């Protein structure tokens, strides 16, 4: 994750490599009866400020919100492996944290606060017709493969967050980059755990 955090030109590669490495370690741990790598929830607990473009935080918040909505709807229908309300809630919490960071809405104790008129890019409801039509597996444009639907949602979230950072022109020196890289990497790792292909051919152009 250090590559992604301190070399913005390799943010995408470093983020996905981190998730890929954790997946490989998890595979080896399972094979040899060892404990899998500990991965904390994909949230921003304890982060109370962010010196990064608002556009980056907004785009990442939308990615979280979209994934949370999709997972929630699929969880309610009960036909999608890996789609749980707990996973949906984690996405929505991260989305709220990103919006709060963008608005600077933290009080002296570090708790989130709210003020009227603050910007919130989240739509809360999104078009997910393709997901509903393909609740078990779906064609993944990025990898060109058919993958488990919940895994596709997680990887789409990770890729959207990576794109938000890499397309920003003023976030290259931010000390938030390692934190944002870790967030996106956790979503990519979750995607692998849910069946998304981990080989390089599926991840890198």
Predicted regions and their residues:
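All-alpha RGS (Regulator of G-protein Signaling) helical domain and cognate RGS-like helical scaffolds
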Residues: 1-205
């Amino acid at each position: 994750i250090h590559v992604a955090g301190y070399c913005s030109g390799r943010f995408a590669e470093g983020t996905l490599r981190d998730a890929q490495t954790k997946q490989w370690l998890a595979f080896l741990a399972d094979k040899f009866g060892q404990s899998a790598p500990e991965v904390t929830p994909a949230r921003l607990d304890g982060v109370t400020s962010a010196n990064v473009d608002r556009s980056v935080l907004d785009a990442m918040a939308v990615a979280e919100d979209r994934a949370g909505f999709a997972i929630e709807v699929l969880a309610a229908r009960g036909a999608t492996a890996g789609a749980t309300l707990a996973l949906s809630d984690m996405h929505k919490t991260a989305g709220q944290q990103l919006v709060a960071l963008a608005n600077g809405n933290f009080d002296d104790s570090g708790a989130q606060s709210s003020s009227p008129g603050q910007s919130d890019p989240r739509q809360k409801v999104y078009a997910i017709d393709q997901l509903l039509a393909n609740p078990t597996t779906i064609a993944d444009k990025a990898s060109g493969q058919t993958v488990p639907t919940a895994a596709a949602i997680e990887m789409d979230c990770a890729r959207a967050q990576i794109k938000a950072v890499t397309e920003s022109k003023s976030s290259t020196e931010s000390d938030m980059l390692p934190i944002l890289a870790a967030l996106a990497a956790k979503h990519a790792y979750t995607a692998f755990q849910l069946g998304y292909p981990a080989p390089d051919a599926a991840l890198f152009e």
